[in-house]
């Protein structure tokens, strides 16, 4: 980042940071905007070192201007940043981006007026830029320099790698700067594959040429001596015009920029091809549950560049769909920012969402909620256990504490029988049951159980008389009385 941020130093950097992004806004340009502009230039196959000088900024603006009408918001933002940087290099005091664009427009108009005035005075021979393919030789004649093989190789490589993705259009605009229709046809003919796309491009060029002929009807009658004819649509496309005629139109007084007109037709056809090669609709671009917000924004704007819509519609898509198609975590954050949030604020707020730290924080919150719910369930379950068992002191007889914690004087003797000399655990006092027997009994079975008795093994003798009973012997009555205890002690005088 250090090399990218070293574009401005000292007083220029202070002047850069004082310029506002919008009129009346609070945000101003920072070093990060220079870093972003350098990365964007690399993405468009332009040299980021051009930002270090005012002349380099002029070259960048000349290459970006043809794409401003059909380009995306990123290209416009890049052009605005370069224009502001140009004012800083030229020591032009501006308050915001709007004033910088106005100053650049004034400078460009003055430069254009100077070029036109010099062309009227000197035949437009000394004011032709050496950067264009049409240059002036030693004899003062306008000659054409063919496109270098390096430029053609770069164009073919972009088409092969990108396959008519949205990046192809600004790349074509940069490589075809100042080219003649013959140069543009040479670039199109070097594309070997994608013949279906090239046929679509030819159809678009033919339609635009027919529209040009309709809007510019041919002049009837012979031309005056020394006057060149007006170009037709096929002349602009380079099919019925020679290279010398194209040079004459482009360097005439007034000039007819047949190269720029043909270039606009080609860019219009490339926009249709890009839309065909990008079948994914902007409505289908959604953020994954674990996808970083920055990657989602990159995919969103890449698909938005291929949309054939006006800037107002694209602005609505950015304000609405970018938030609507985000994942739930980012959507919650973006809705909290409000409607007027900028893209920079959105990316700053959603930074880290989906990463390890965010996952750990979400997991910790989920675990804390789960533990709280479990504790609530345990408390609810404990409410169904009923009242606790009260404890009673054996020393004072009161409830609520144990004998070892009792503050009353120590009770002497056994806590059961009250006698001294032994403890309750060693007390021999036994409690009688409801039958009057000491419990537990030391002999035989308990008294409330049926006692053992001798049962005869043979049936009793049957009486031969009628209605006679055998009287029991006194000995047997005494035995039965001993087997069953008396209940007089329990029931009083009952028989």
UniProtKB/Swiss-Prot annotation:
GO terms for biological process: viral budding via host ESCRT complex; viral translational frameshifting. The modification Asymmetric dimethylarginine is found at residues 388, 410. The keyword Phosphoprotein applies. Residues 217-225 are annotated as: PPIA/CYPA-binding loop. A motif (Nuclear export signal) lies at residues 16-22. The record marks 132-133, 363-364, 378-379, 433-434, 449-450 as: Cleavage. Residues 438-495 are annotated as: Disordered. GO terms for cellular component: host cell nucleus; host cell plasma membrane; host multivesicular body; membrane; viral nucleocapsid; virion membrane. This is Gag polyprotein.
